[in-house]
Amino acid sequence: MKIYLVGGAVRDQLLGLPVKDRDWIVVGADPATLLSLGYQQVGKDFPVFLNPKTKEEYALARTERKSSTGYTGFICDFSPTITLEQDLIRRDLTINAMAQSEDGEIIDPYGGKQDLENRILRHISPAFSEDPLRVLRVARFAARYHSLGFKIASETLALMAELAQSGELQHLTAERVWLETEKALNEKNPEIYFETLHKTGALSVLFSEIDALHGVPNPVKHHPEVDSFIHTMLVLKQAVNLTENNPILNKSAVRFAAICHDLGKALTPQNILPHHYGHEQAGIKPTRSLCKRLKVPSYFQELAELTCEFHTHIHKAFELRAETVITLFNRFDVWRKSQRFQEFLQVCLADTRGRTGFENKDYPQIDYINQLLHAANEVDVQQVIADGFEKQAIKNELTKRRILAVKQTKTNYPTN
């Protein structure tokens, strides 16, 4: 029996990156052997065992043979005769198909180390096409390692495009698509994930609402980048910058809202382009459709829909009447969900800066709207009750006093 460290741990170690998870492969053993050594079996589909001391995962070496459509349609062989090389070749990319022996030797039968040095994401064999999930995984790796200069090999991109056209992607479950997408949203360059999926044709299959933004123009005065998809990717990049070092915000939810904020522009009638009157309200339906299909968590969906509807309110914050401001606060339920409103404001800032040449633009609207929020929050509901108001009258009086507080703050707010 031999044990090897495999996959991401070896890859990241060679890249000089911190190793998060360590996966191990056991060659020349069967389940009974590991159980006798105190390992605990946790996998039903695949024999995976927890080390009794470290609790790290150890899997028996295996081969896979395609038996039906989708990413689950495989027949696996876990016999003790399976070699390390046979196990490694079933993996997706050469950089993920390296192993390290217990004495520290790197086993690299498929050129992963060379591809690491050359910053190439390359598939190992034509068997890559047997698992449609790999299209998303490779796009996610491209997002993760883009800042290190990694590119996808042209032949791998071609295979990904073939998979996108084959109909295999439709067999992926919503949960798997969302899991990969949420992971991608947390990478350093999530825009590369979506750009890669567009390049391969997978975006139109899995994220048609986002893909529909391609080629939709904006007024060049406000959007020098013109194209709505390009703008959305720039907004996503800005959202990454704004959330990267902010542990309070739900960064993947903010980034998802950034992607959805202008989905309504794809529905703008041709005769009024490049203007997009009413795109805010129009964006709710495609956002809801996307979220329902991919079973996106409700928190993400709520933030994305609210962002679609109200992002231009913040752009025009200085023009809003006090009554409109309180209506906005009520819609976001800022009284109980203050963090969600702050996440929304970050998307609005990302939207302003996600335009060519506007990357460092000041956005005083956030300070202004937060001052109005502070004023509204200072209104004491207990005082309203103490003043003798009851039932529905409490709510009406509370709203009235909040509007008055906002009006006073607006009057006193410095205009320059």
UniProtKB/Swiss-Prot annotation:
Q: Which keywords does this chain's UniProt record carry?
A: ATP-binding, Hydrolase, Magnesium, Metal-binding, Multifunctional enzyme, Nickel, Nucleotide-binding, Nucleotidyltransferase, RNA repair, RNA-binding, Transferase, tRNA processing
Q: Which reaction does it catalyse?
A: a tRNA precursor + 2 CTP + ATP = a tRNA with a 3' CCA end + 3 diphosphate; a tRNA with a 3' CCA end + 2 CTP + ATP = a tRNA with a 3' CCACCA end + 3 diphosphate
Q: Per its UniProt record, what InterPro entries does this chain match? A: CCA_bact (IPR012006), HD/PDEase_dom (IPR003607), HD_domain (IPR006674), NT_sf (IPR043519), PolA_pol_head_dom (IPR002646), PolyA_RNA-bd (IPR032828), tRNA_CCA-adding_enzyme (IPR050124)
Coiled coil region boundaries: none
Q: Which domain of life is it from?
A: Bacteria
* SUPFAM superfamilies attached to this UniProt entry: Nucleotidyltransferase, Poly A polymerase C-terminal region-like
What residues does Mg(2+) bind to? D21, D23
Residues annotated as binding CTP are: G8, R11, R91, R137, R140
Q: Can you tell me which residues bind ATP?
A: G8, R11, R91, R137, R140
Q: Which terms does the record give in the GO molecular function aspect?
A: ATP binding; CCA tRNA nucleotidyltransferase activity; cyclic-nucleotide phosphodiesterase activity; magnesium ion binding; phosphatase activity; tRNA binding
Pfam families referenced in this protein's UniProt entry, alphabetically: HD (PF01966), PolyA_pol (PF01743), PolyA_pol_RNAbd (PF12627)
Task: List the CDD domains.
Answer: HDc (cd00077), NT_ClassII-CCAase (cd05398)
EC number(s) per entry: 2.7.7.72, 3.1.3.-, 3.1.4.-
What cofactor(s) does the depicted protein rely on?
Mg(2+); Ni(2+)
Keyword Metal-binding in the entry? The reply is yes
Q: How is the cofactor bound?
A: Magnesium is required for nucleotidyltransferase activity. Nickel for phosphatase activity.
- Enumerate the Gene Ontology biological process terms: RNA repair; tRNA 3'-terminal CCA addition
Functional description taken from the UniProt entry: Catalyzes the addition and repair of the essential 3'-terminal CCA sequence in tRNAs without using a nucleic acid template. Adds these three nucleotides in the order of C, C, and A to the tRNA nucleotide-73, using CTP and ATP as substrates and producing inorganic pyrophosphate. tRNA 3'-terminal CCA addition is required both for tRNA processing and repair. Also involved in tRNA surveillance by mediating tandem CCA addition to generate a CCACCA at the 3' terminus of unstable tRNAs. While stable tRNAs receive only 3'-terminal CCA, unstable tRNAs are marked with CCACCA and rapidly degraded.
Instruction: Provide the domain comment.
Output: Comprises two domains: an N-terminal domain containing the nucleotidyltransferase activity and a C-terminal HD domain associated with both phosphodiesterase and phosphatase activities.
- Quaternary arrangement and interactors, per the entry? Monomer. Can also form homodimers and oligomers.
Q: List the NCBIfam families.
A: PRK10885.1
UniProt family annotation:
Belongs to the tRNA nucleotidyltransferase/poly(A) polymerase family. Bacterial CCA-adding enzyme type 1 subfamily.
Give the misc comment.
A single active site specifically recognizes both ATP and CTP and is responsible for their addition.
Q: Which HAMAP family match?
A: CCA_bact_type1, CCA_bact_type2
What name is this protein filed under?
Multifunctional CCA protein
**Organism, scientific name:** Haemophilus influenzae (strain PittGG)
Protein encoded by which gene: cca
